């Protein structure tokens, strides 16, 4: 039996007081395309303190006393392993730590616990220190530390003393002068660095507590790697903050991309992400400067932890490899063997067994089961329109990675970069084979709302699409319902093109509200709580209710009523142009407006000074026999509206146009009834890649029709 569902919706349009009726007919018996079972996933990047002080559950900031960048974020020093942290005027400054109860603390730079650590802390308690008046240090955490009644906290630290000494120590969390969690214990410390572990429970709640480590008698102790963890997601050691990880799990992700983003590349070779320095015991990880987003990373949440989190979320891991490019420079493309080997070793670490070097290291690090890594992205935003940007020889780099990875791991799916900005239709401009292409879109709500059909024209025989980064980033504040609805329309379009779009991920996910480097973000948090934007709930709604396939639909709607009276206009966007011969006629041949040469007497010669100018530099050449109109500014939204008001139900607009310079093409304005209500034919927009008709009603924009295309200069 054929089932037909009919839905009728009424929407009010800003241009007129009339309503438009649309009827959507759904035929559930006629199958369309299969929807990708891996469509919705996560894009994770260390940005906005997403990990440090966020998803990575470590509560103590500057736990290894390495960070000395307070107040001088743009200075760097070389510690023998490359750029890491800044050098303040006072090298003894230890950010986020302070002395309490008359104690003295100093940076220790000799006799360290290993070759990775460059500093430790030497604590000397007050000569009057006692159990009633202890003396020591405190840490402010990442804008506070949450204390929770009943939660178990795990403190680990490394210590040594000048001689074998038994210390009485009080530690815990304190807020407003009161202990919210506390434990007093005794430890014998020797001149050899040793690791100590203590647990204690919270006895009261506080949103912004501080951590204290106090000596109950005079003495000197050297400390390093002072670490405090609350209960973690799935009780993983060195794991994730529960509420943030649970919010990720509630999105039902099918994959998790990591570690970025620009975080992959860094601002130099030394500040790029190197996975081999992020595995093993945390005290053996040097950390690195997250130069792109302006803060140091412990790399406590490293490659191993990313793989573990993906497994815990039920998501496939998607690892982004560096192709020898960083922001502002690169390794010559014919000298990238080290980067290729790093990628091969990363796959071996994830998937190898005990007979392999890196598989054995994974097992030694506590994860016997392989991680089934089969998705590798080759580079991040490295294939741009302008080859003089950071995308130096991306195609040649990609080809080397493809050959090496497919030879050893033929099952691995490789994701290539395409243009990440400057166009709505990025393309793979080389002959190398590729499994998926990564497209990025950061646009307005109206752009997304107009893009339901975006993928309709894509080649069904070409590479699959991974829309790896997308979000409304303008006209949305910190994220609102309008943004979420625009994204939802775009997401439905991806589902409707399931034979093309295989994967998609919103970006970015997290922001610590105390250090926003990007806006908007899906999940916001501070030390005590987390909350989500409307976009987060749309992501969850779509992922939890994704179907297996589409069905046939037919949409019929009344046309938007045309205005009774209107004007027309000309425009340009970051382009210099010339126009002549503007002519507006009715279907029966009646002329409503005509741009004529200065010698004509039938119609007055056009003088652009009489037009309504929105922006740009406009001039009309009254001496030219054709009366040419020129726009010579390189600026956005350069529009000139003809002063003549016309009246007709249907009409044709013709004009001759020539592009003389700039990035795009022409704008032909019609149905203009005011600055906030008009339509235009956008020829060669979006970086000279696309033609489109766009409707602007009450300043909101939709795109009823579009097609790929470009124009040449001086034609």
What are these regions (language model features)?
Residues 23-26, 195-228, 363-365, 560-574, ...:
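Extracellular beta-strand ligand-recognition surfaces/modules
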Residues 42, 73-122, 264-303, 335-339, ...:
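Aromatic- and acidic-residue-enriched carbohydrate-binding clefts of CAZyme catalytic domains
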Residues 176-206, 560-562, 704-714:
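Extracellular carbohydrate recognition and processing domains
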Residues 176-187, 195-197, 202, 230, ...:
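Active-site cleft segment of glycoside hydrolase catalytic domains centered on the general acid/base Glu
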Residues 633-701:
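Secretory/extracellular carbohydrate-interaction modules
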Residues 108-133, 619-639, 651, 690-696:
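Short carbohydrate-recognition loop motifs
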Residues 308-309, 400-413, 428-431, 435-545:
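Catalytic-core region of carbohydrate-active enzymes that cleave or remodel glycosidic bonds
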Residues 61-68, 121, 136-169, 194-201, ...:
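Extra-cytoplasmic beta-strand recognition segments
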């Amino acid at each position: 039996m054929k089932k037909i569902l009919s839905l009728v919706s009424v929407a009010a349009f800003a241009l007129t007081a009339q309503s438009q009726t649309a009827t959507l007919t759904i035929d559930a018996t006629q199958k369309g395309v299969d929807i990708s079972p891996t469509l919705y996933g996560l894009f994770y990047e260390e940005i906005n303190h997403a990990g440090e002080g966020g998803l990575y559950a470590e509560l103590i900031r500057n736990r290894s006393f390495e960070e000395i960048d307070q107040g001088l974020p743009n200075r760097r020093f070389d510690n023998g392993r490359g750029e890491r942290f800044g050098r303040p005027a006072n090298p003894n400054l230890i950010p986020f730590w302070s002395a309490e109860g008359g104690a003295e603390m100093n940076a220790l730079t000799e006799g360290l616990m290993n070759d990775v650590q460059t500093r430790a802390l030497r604590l000397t308690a007050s000569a009057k220190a006692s159990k009633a008046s202890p003396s020591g240090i405190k840490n402010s955490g990442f804008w506070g530390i949450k204390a929770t009644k009943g939660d178990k906290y795990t403190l680990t630290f490394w210590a040594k003393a000048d001689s074998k000494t038994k210390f009485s120590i009080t530690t815990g969390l304190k807020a407003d002068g009161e202990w919210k969690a506390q434990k007093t214990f005794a430890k014998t410390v020797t001149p050899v660095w040793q690791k100590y572990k203590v647990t204690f429970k919270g006895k009261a709640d506080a949103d912004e507590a501080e951590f204290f480590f106090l000596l109950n008698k005079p003495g000197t102790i050297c400390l390093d790697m002072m670490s405090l963890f609350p209960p973690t997601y799935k009780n993983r050691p060195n794991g994730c903050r529960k509420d943030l990880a649970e919010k990720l799990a509630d999105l039902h992700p099918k994959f998790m991309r990591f570690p970025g983003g620009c975080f992959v590349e860094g601002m130099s070779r030394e500040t790029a992400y190197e996975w081999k320095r992020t595995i093993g015991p945390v005290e053996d990880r040097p950390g690195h400067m997250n130069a792109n987003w302006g803060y140091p990373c412990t790399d406590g949440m490293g490659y191993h932890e990313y793989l573990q989190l993906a497994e815990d979320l039920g998501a496939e891991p998607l690892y982004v490899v560096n192709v020898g490019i960083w922001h502002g420079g690169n390794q010559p493309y014919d000298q990238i063997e080290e980067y290729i080997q790093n990628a091969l070793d990363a796959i071996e670490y994830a998937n190898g067994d005990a007979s392999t070097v890196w598989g054995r290291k994974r097992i030694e690090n506590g994860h016997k089961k392989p991680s089934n890594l089969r998705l590798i992205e080759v580079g991040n935003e490295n294939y741009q329109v302008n080859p003089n940007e950071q995308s130096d020889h991306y195609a040649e780099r990609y080809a080397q990675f493809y050959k090496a990875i497919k030879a050893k791991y033929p099952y691995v799916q490789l994701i290539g970069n395409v243009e990440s900005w400057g166009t709505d239709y990025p393309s793979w401009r080389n002959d190398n084979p590729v499994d998926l292409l990564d497209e990025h879109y950061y646009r307005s709500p109206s752009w997304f709302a107009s893009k339901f059909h975006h993928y309709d024209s894509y080649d069904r025989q070409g590479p699959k699409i991974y829309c790896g980064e997308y979000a409304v980033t303008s006209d949305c504040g910190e994220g609102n319902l309008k943004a979420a609805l625009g994204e939802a329309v775009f997401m439905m379009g991806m589902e409707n093109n399931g034979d093309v779009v295989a994967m998609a991920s919103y970006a970015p996910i997290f922001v610590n509200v105390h250090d926003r480097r990007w806006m908007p973000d899906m999940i916001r948090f501070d030390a005590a709580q987390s909350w989500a934007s409307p976009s987060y709930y749309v992501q969850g709604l779509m992922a939890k209710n994704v179907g297996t396939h589409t069905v046939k639909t037919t949409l019929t709607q009344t046309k938007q009523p045309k205005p009774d009276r209107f004007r027309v206009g000309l425009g340009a966007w970051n382009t210099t142009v010339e126009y002549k011969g503007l002519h507006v006629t009715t279907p029966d041949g009646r002329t409503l407006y005509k741009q004529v040469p200065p010698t004509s007497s039938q119609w007055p010669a056009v003088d652009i000074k009489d037009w309504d100018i929105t922006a740009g530099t406009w001039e009309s050449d009254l001496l030219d026999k054709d009366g040419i109109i020129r726009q010579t500014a390189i600026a956005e939204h350069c529009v000139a509206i003809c002063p003549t008001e016309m009246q007709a139900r249907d009409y044709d607009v013709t004009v001759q146009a020539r592009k003389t310079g700039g990035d795009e093409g022409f704008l032909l304005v019609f149905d203009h009834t005011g600055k906030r209500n008009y339509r235009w034919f956008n020829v060669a927009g979006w970086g000279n890649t696309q033609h489109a008709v766009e409707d602007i009603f009450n300043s909101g924009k939709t795109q009823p029709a579009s097609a790929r295309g470009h124009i040449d200069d001086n034609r």
